[in-house]
C-alpha cells in the first residue's frame, strides 16, 4: 500500500513558536522563501521525527528539554510550553485510517512496539538539500 505525507505540525520547534500546520496533501513540494522564514525548521522537523525510531528515548527527549544544550525548542518558548513535531500519513486509494506520529516533550509515538511504519518509511526516505545538490554539481563539473 502506498502512503503519502498529508501534513507536518510543529509547535515551539525551532522557528515556529505558535502551532504551525504545513499541509502537503500527499503532493511533492519545493520549499523556497526568504532567509529566516522557517524552511529549514520544516525540513529539520520532518527529518528529526523520521530518524527518531533509530535513537534511544533519551536522545529524542533532549530535543524538547529546555535544559539540554541540544534542544530544538523555539528560543522564545517558556519552559512549560508544549513542544512537538507531528506528522499524518494518508493511504493512497484505500479506505484505511491515517497514521499519526508525534515526538514531543510528553510523547514519542515513533517507537511503538509492533509498528514498523516509520522504520520502513525511513528506509525509503531521502532528504535532498542544497548541500547535496551543490556536491552533485561540483562532482559533475569537476570531470
Language-model features: where?
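N-terminal nucleotide-handling cores and adjacent loading/scaffold lobes of large enzymes
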Residues: 1-143
